[in-house]
Design a protein with these regions (language model features):
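Non-catalytic pre-domain segments flanking phosphatase-related domains
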Residues: 1-101
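C-terminal cap/substrate-recognition subdomain and adjoining C-terminal extension
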Residues: 1-2, 8, 153, 158-250, ...
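Electropositive phosphate-/nucleotide-binding environments in soluble metabolic enzymes
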Residues: 23, 63, 67, 107-110, ...
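Alpha-helical substrate-recognition element adjacent to the catalytic core
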Residues: 45-56, 90-94, 104-214
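Asp-based phosphoryl-transfer active-site loop
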Residues: 97-111, 308, 313
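Intrinsic-disorder-associated, low-complexity terminal segments enriched in Asp/Asn/His/Tyr and depleted
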Residues: 252, 258, 264, 268-270, ...
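Low-complexity, intrinsically disordered segments with a bias for serine/threonine
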Residues: 261-263, 267, 275, 289, ...
Length: 353
């Protein structure tokens, strides 16, 4: 939950766009930020293909200016199609230490459930349910069960083929690499399926994944899931537990002997999906907290696009709406309005790796 910037608090405001930053917006941004922070350090984060500006300062004593700061900076930028973020405290100084992102239409192109449904012949029906669930019009768990039921009989081989075709949104690899270079961990939370996203998470070096697991029998999907469903509450729980260096039952954590009992993998060791799911747990952590280490929630970022992401966004230090539904955009602290995640690195004030 956003609270006004406090006197003496480090503050950063960053802009990013693939188009030239409007001159009038730059004048406005420098004036508003300077009025609230006095002396300002200015730089342009180096992210290929983006025009950027990042202002850093220490909040002054004008309480009225600080109260209005976020809205006076954010509103004009978004109105002009420029993505932006206001960060504060330690995050303003060095960036976050943990980024947790939704997956479907945020970290990957499209919705995995819709891809599976197209293959199963239930695409239009499932797409309509997905849209309603994303808008918060349906109970997520019930909507998921209804959609997964339409996948009954879809072969494991077809699921593997779809998983192989999954692509991250542009810049996702840059965001992960840049975060790791800064000592920041990256986790994924998804109402989708570990069998679909596990391999991609491993290839990109994602530190931890929480997703649903598909039940299989005889080389095909049964139309059911296994284990506890990933709801908006479980997404928030994952962010909180991971920030504490804790273990979340049902999550794929950094692999090897450290993987917890009950990790989110298919239970059949002979299933072809077992290896694919296991890949998601094999990613080696570069910045993930140990059980003895704690990351304050003020140093976390939650990124998402739908109603199912709002609970984790509410508790994160910075909530980022990524190509989001209007209600999510209105609730978020920051926005990425284009399908490329290197913009998130830029508005955190980071140079891309």
């Amino acid at each position: 939950m956003y609270e006004p910037v406090r006197e003496g608090e480090p503050v950063r405001f960053s802009l990013a766009s693939p188009e030239p930053l409007p001159a009038g917006l730059l004048v406005h941004t420098r004036h508003v930020f300077g009025s609230a922070c006095g002396e300002v350090a200015e730089r342009s984060p180096a992210v290929p293909g983006l025009q950027t500006l990042s202002l850093f300062g220490v909040a002054g004593s004008d309480a009225s200016a600080l109260e209005r700061l976020r809205d006076e900076l954010r509103g004009p930028a978004l109105a002009l199609g420029v993505d932006c973020a206001l960060t504060r405290g330690k995050m303003a100084e060095r960036g976050p230490r943990l980024i947790v992102s939704d997956v479907d239409s945020t970290f990957i192109r499209g919705e995995a459930i819709d891809m599976l449904a197209d293959a199963a012949g239930s695409g239009p029906r499932v797409a309509a349910i997905t849209e309603a669930a994303m808008n918060g019009e349906l109970d997520f768990a019930e909507a998921l069960a209804e959609r997964v039921a339409t996948l009954e009989g879809l072969s494991v081989d077809r699921v593997e083929s779809i998983a192989d075709s999954i692509e991250p949104v542009p810049g996702a690899d840059t965001l992960v690499a840049t975060a790791h270079a800064r000592g920041c961990a990256v986790g994924l939370v998804s109402g989708g399926f570990i069998e679909v996203i596990g391999g991609l998470a491993r290839r990109l070096g994602v530190d931890c994944v929480l997703a649903n697991r598909l039940e299989t029998s005889g080389g095909a999907l049964t139309g059911r899931t296994e284990g506890e469903i990933v709801t908006r509450e479980r997404k928030a729980e994952a962010l909180r537990r991971w920030s504490e260096g804790g273990r979340l039952p049902g999550a794929d954590l950094p692999g090897g002997s450290d993987s917890p009992e009950g990790s989110n993998l298919p239970k059949d060791p002979d299933s072809p999906l077992e290896a694919r799911g296991r890949e998601g747990a094999d990613a080696r952590s570069r910045g993930f907290p140990s059980p003895r280490e704690r990351i304050d929630l003020s140093e976390t970022v939650a990124a998402g696009d739908g109603a199912n992401d709002l609970s984790m966004m509410e508790i994160a230090g910075l909530s980022v709406a990524v190509c989001a539904k209007p209600a999510v955009l209105a609730a978020a602290d920051a926005a990425v309005t284009r399908p490329r995640l290197d913009i998130l690195a830029a508005i955190l004030g980071w140079d891309a790796v």
